[in-house]
Amino acid sequence: MIKKIILPSLSIFLFTACSLKMPEFSMPSFLSFSDDKDAIALEKANVCQKIEDMDNKLFCYRKIVNENSYAQLRMGTYSVEKKDYKKAIEYLNQSIDNENAYANLALAFLYYKGDGVEKDIDKAFKLLNDSSDIDPNAAYQLSRFYLQGINTKVDVDKGIDLLEFAASKNMLAAQKMLVSIYKDGLFSQEKDAKKVKQWEDIIKKDIRDTNFEVYKL
């Protein structure tokens, strides 16, 4: 379903041992840009992303990392893979300071797991919440908090709203979750054959889910 990416340690963002399965950690087919500067930054970072040789790829990113929030994001996730958490946190915070909402998910993972930082579920929740209206990945992960009452009271309506946002951006995992919810009546929802068919029809279109590309080195 999703290509293997450079950060296997982030491949499954598990908040709980519940049976709800999390998506692989990987970059959005849609990206919300606040201005042309942001789009240009992504374009420059994507030049590096397309380089196959790892040494040359890293050299490319390092040339632009001081000024490019997407390079900071990707070097951050790469540093997590290398277990250089100090550097990862530095890069990810740089990216967030430069208003890149996609870095929130990666940093939230570290705070949730307590990797390189003191474990802080409140911080993880806030980071996801702050980016959930932009990043489908963050919205999907945050839905788990609301559906299961992790660090907040159970709010099924909010959880489903977040799932629907992610699903509308072609996140396959969110689409499948909505099918399960309405087919099996999960989370005290009424079974709804019409909604099941709606999401199954979308899934059948087999549109490639590229919602994780933004994190790929």
Tell me what each language-model feature is.
Residues 1-21:
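Classical Sec-dependent N-terminal signal peptides that target proteins to the secretory pathway
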Residues 18-74, 216:
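N-terminal leader/linker segments that initiate helical-solenoid repeat arrays
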Residues 37, 66-69, 79, 98-100, ...:
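Short helix-capping/linker turns of helical repeat alpha-solenoids
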Residues 73-81, 106-113, 139-148, 179-184:
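Hydrophobic face of amphipathic alpha-helices that form TPR/SEL1-like repeat modules
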Residues 181-217:
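Terminal, low-structured helical/coil segments at or just beyond the last alpha-helical repeat
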